[in-house]
Structures are given as structure tokens and as C-alpha cells.
Amino acid sequence: MVVLQGVAKSYNGTAALSPLTLHIRDGERVALLGPSGSGKTTLLNLIGGVIKPDQGAVTLDGIDVASLHPGRELAGLVGVMHQQLDLVPHLSVMHNIMAGRLGYWSLWRSLVSLVAPQEKPMVQDALLRVGIPDKLYERTSHLSGGEQQRVALARLLAQGSRVVLADEPVASLDPARAEDLMQLLTRIVSESNKTLIASIHTTHLARAYFTRAIGLRQGKVQFDLPVVKLSDNILNGLYNLSEGPAKAKA
């Protein structure tokens, strides 16, 4: 379970997140909604251990994220899919996927893998699961945007994290490819009973692929409810900065 207890974060005296408390159960698929600057990325970075809260605590299965080593300890619990993907363009698909294992390897094994790839069967299986098994030796820069998204997802599979964080995972894709990736992402996390927490800018994707929606505006939680209760009225209120959002009970 992911728990944020009284968590707050500010930058240069400006609140990015006001104190909030959230409990996210194992296997949930949670969509973070809200206008730009609402605190979605800050919330993901807190859960992922990228930044520390100014107050409160973030725990994963009862373990304080701030106490975890950013290598093996954190990698086994949290995997992150950034909008920029963080792939190395000049490296092969295989080497980019193996990067998901670096948190588990010694420095020596990591260096050896550059010339003698490690755990190749695992990499092949990850590519098979994301639907591009023939791209193993392809240079990553030669792939389409959709294929690069799948490589980033395969790297998450290789990492083996129990919680997957995705920051606008389909922002750079056209509608058809966005649907394809969301279908693939949610299928994989569901099959593995992983927890998915993603910031999403397209509300119909939140309704179609997630079980729970959390609305943020100006660093505050405006609603937290099952997606089946996510009405147009609630969404219009969230994105209309001149009016307060309609409230909903979970």
C-alpha cells in the first residue's frame, strides 16, 4: 500500500502541495487529474522518492520512502515512466531495457553488460510482452515514438517494481497510439497486480483505463472518487480556474 500522511511540499515559499493524506491500495489504477501546475508531478516525485516532503511522510508497505537507498531498495518498489522516457538514443533497445536492472547489479556487472549483455532472456520476454520482440538489437533512435514508449514500458517490466508511476505517459502520442499504449500499460499492470499511479491530461482515458481518480488544483485535492462517479460537472469544475470545482463523495 502507498500511504501519504500529512504530506506537503513547497518551492521557494510557494506551496506545490498543501498537506494531504492518501491511501492507495495494492493493484489500484489511479489517475491524477488537474490543470498544469496543480501538483500532479510533485505528487509523483514524492511517491517515487525523487524529492522529500517538507512535512509528513510517504510510505510503501510501511517503509518510509525517504529512508530507502535510491538503487536496489527503491527500484524494487517503484518504477517511473517519464514523459521524456529517459531512453539513451544511441544505445540498442536491449541495453536500454537492461538499464531497468542496474539498481540490482554491482558496478562490475553493469560495466560487463555493456559488452556482454546480462539477463538477455528477461529482456526478450519483456519485449514480447509489449509487442515488439523483433526490436531487440535495433538502435533506439531509429524507433517510432510509439515504439520508444513500448521500450520504456519494457524497461519497467525488467525493473520488476510493484508500483508504477507514469507522468503524462501518452502526452506525445496521437489519439490512436495513446489508446494502444494505455491498453497495453493497464493490461500489464493488471496481470502483474501492480499499482499504477499516473498523471493524465485526457479525461476520457482516465475514465476508460483507471479505477480511481484524484483531482488536484493549486496543490489541493479537489476530489478522490471511483471513476464511475467522475461526471462532466466535476471535471468542468476542476479545470475552470474561475470557479470552484463541484465536490463529490466517494
Task: Please identify what each model-predicted range represents.
Residues 48:
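Helix-to-loop junction immediately C-terminal to a conserved catalytic motif
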Residues 64-79, 113-116:
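ABC ATPase NBD coupling module
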Residues 109-135:
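Conserved ABC ATPase "signature" region
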Residues 139-143, 147:
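Conserved ABC ATPase signature
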Residues 164-167:
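Catalytic Walker B motif of ABC-type/P-loop ATPase nucleotide-binding domains
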Residues 175-177:
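Helix N-cap at the start of a conserved alpha-helix in ABC-type nucleotide-binding domains
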Residues 200-201:
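H-loop/switch region of ABC-family ATPase nucleotide-binding domains
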